[in-house]
Design a protein with these regions (language model features):
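Beta-strand elements of well-folded, non-transmembrane domains
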Residues: 80, 135-137, 188-192
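Mid-length scaffold segments of soluble, non-membrane domains
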Residues: 103-108, 112-114
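N-terminal secretory signal peptides and thylakoid transit peptides that target proteins
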Residues: 1-17
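Short, well-ordered beta-strand segments in beta-rich or mixed alpha/beta enzyme
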Residues: 72, 76, 129-138
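RNase H-like nuclease fold core
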Residues: 64-98
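Phosphate/pyrophosphate-binding loops at sites that engage ATP/ADP/AMP, CoA/4′-phosphopantetheine
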Residues: 118-125
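Short, conserved loop-to-beta-strand elements that form functional interface hotspots
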Residues: 146-182
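C-terminal segment of N-terminal export signals and the immediately downstream linker at the start
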Residues: 25-55
Length: 193
């Protein structure tokens, strides 16, 4: 097999997988690598003490996920654990920053459960593209970013920076469904199954 070098790519233009002799290698290992990644993700979650739960059911008249091409959109996830909402109230009042971070971690875990339900295999996640965090908080609260770090750091810890790093937006609101303190929307890039 030829040596791959950045200089050769820059000088010679496009280098195809065939010219590198990688077509057969990549084609034959794609599904096994995906399966390994999926198992690795679920094992990593178990090692963290957060095994992948069953995907929560929507709390309204909507679908939990929608796939379009290579994008997977996950509806707002609430901090459900074993069918129970775990974090109600307002951050800065009944809920501390640390409790809000833990609630966002649970929302992120539930987003992965939704991805597994839709894709059948977490190894198909190419990357988390964007997250949007909604935070029910008291007037004057300014540490929204710190609270959403619970979800951001979780995705990087579970998927690594390349797949787990993402863009994001967080906003404070007066109320959220069912009285929850946080909700998380997730956009993922995925591979075909």
């Amino acid at each position: 097999m030829r040596e791959f070098s950045r200089r050769r790519v820059m000088k010679g233009g496009v280098v195809t997988l065939a010219s590198l002799g990688l077509i057969g290698v990549l084609g034959s290992t794609k599904s096994s690598l995906q399966a390994q990644e999926s198992g690795d993700i679920e094992q990593r979650l178990r090692d963290m003490g957060m095994p992948l739960p069953k995907a929560p059911k929507p709390v309204g008249a909507y679908v939990a996920t929608r796939k379009s091409g290579n994008l997977l959109f996950i509806s707002g996830q609430l901090p459900f654990a074993e069918g129970k909402l775990t974090c109600k109230g307002k951050v800065g009042q009944e809920i501390s920053i640390e409790q809000g971070q833990a609630a966002f971690r649970l929302c992120a875990l539930n987003a992965l459960a939704q991805a597994k339900e839709n894709l059948g295999d977490l190894g198909r996640i190419s990357g988390i593209l964007k997250i949007v965090g909604y935070l029910c908080c008291v007037d004057g609260f300014v540490d929204h970013a710190k609270v959403l770090n619970g979800a951001s750091e979780f995705f990087v810890q579970v998927l690594g920076m390349e797949k787990g790093g993402h863009t994001r937006m967080v906003m404070g609101v007066q109320s959220l469904p069912l009285g929850t303190a946080v909700a998380l929307e997730v956009w993922m890039e995925v591979t075909e199954g």
